[in-house]
């Protein structure tokens, strides 16, 4: 096996170990949603929201960590932050800027928006996890976080689709999402341009994961605790 292959195998083992440790600490994987072999298992909406909120918080934590690490290692002195304003592919989706704005939106619309943002990240996260391996001397900590975020975003999307199906009467909502066409930017030959593309994508990921985290807390408070939070 090549050194790179051995390194990647070790990376994925590290992903499993660290993610299981962190998720267990957060209480996300403490119990299966339904016991194996159970029939007609019905998980409460409150429990579904508990898991979604914990998972979204974990994703935002990882997104902040990977952005900060990338910023410190590759972005210093390059002026990336001044160019990274309003450059997110999800900007086409009208999203509340904070909890106060989110509280003004009907819960079904806010649920659809959460699902739409999560769907919008499916494709870019898949390519982030693969293309980040091509960055010169990329540390394993950045690599495994990219892989882990992609996996956990899929888990959160699946959980949110269950919540939407439970909350919505009849129609499970429109399949809204924002298309991402940034793969060529992650493969540019010019190093500065390529690194900025990664920086901008991670900057947007941190921003959107924070929004999702806030929206889910608002939704949980409204739907589970009757806004008494």
Curated annotation (Swiss-Prot):
Transmembrane residue ranges: none
GO molecular function, one term: hormone activity
A biological process from GO: prolactin signaling pathway
Gene3D superfamilies, sorted: 1.20.1250.10
Disulfide bonds, paired cysteine numbers: 34-41, 88-204, 221-229
Signal peptide positions (record): 1-30
Any one GO cellular component localisation term in the record: extracellular space
Keywords: Disulfide bond, Hormone, Secreted, Signal
CDD domains referenced in this protein's UniProt entry, alphabetically: prolactin_like
InterPro entries: 4_helix_cytokine-like_core, Somatotropin/Prolactin, Somatotropin_CS
Highest taxon above the source species: Eukaryota
Cellular location(s): Secreted
PANTHER family: PROLACTIN (PTHR11417:SF5), SOMATOTROPIN,PROLACTIN (PTHR11417)
Membership in a protein family: Belongs to the somatotropin/prolactin family.
Identification of the protein by name: Prolactin
Gene source species: Gallus gallus (Chicken)
The organism's taxonomic lineage, starting at the top: Eukaryota, Metazoa, Chordata, Craniata, Vertebrata
Name of the encoding gene: PRL
């Amino acid at each position: 096996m090549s050194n790179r292959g051995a390194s990647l195998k070790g990376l994925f083992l590290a992903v499993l170990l660290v993610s299981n440790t962190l998720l267990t600490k957060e209480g996300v994987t403490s119990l299966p949603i339904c016991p194996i072999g159970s029939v007609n298992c019905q998980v409460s909406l409150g429990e579904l929201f508990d898991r979604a909120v914990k998972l979204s918080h974990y994703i935002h934590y990882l997104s902040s960590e990977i952005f900060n690490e990338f910023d410190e290692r590759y972005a210093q002195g390059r002026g990336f932050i001044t160019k990274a304003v309003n450059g997110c592919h999800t900007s086409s989706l009208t999203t509340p800027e904070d909890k106060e704005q989110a509280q003004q939106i009907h819960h079904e619309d806010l649920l659809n928006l959460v699902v739409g943002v999560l769907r919008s990240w499916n494709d870019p996260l898949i390519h982030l996890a693969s293309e980040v391996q091509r960055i010169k001397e990329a540390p394993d900590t950045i690599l495994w976080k990219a892989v882990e975020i992609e996996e956990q975003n899929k888990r959160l999307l699946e959980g949110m689709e269950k919540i939407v199906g439970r909350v919505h009467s009849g129609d499970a909502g429109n399949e809204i999402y924002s298309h991402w066409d940034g793969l060529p930017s992650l493969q540019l030959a010019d190093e500065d341009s390529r690194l900025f593309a990664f920086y901008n994508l991670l900057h947007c990921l941190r921003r959107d994961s924070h929004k999702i985290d806030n929206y889910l807390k608002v939704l949980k408070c409204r739907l589970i605790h009757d806004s008494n939070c």
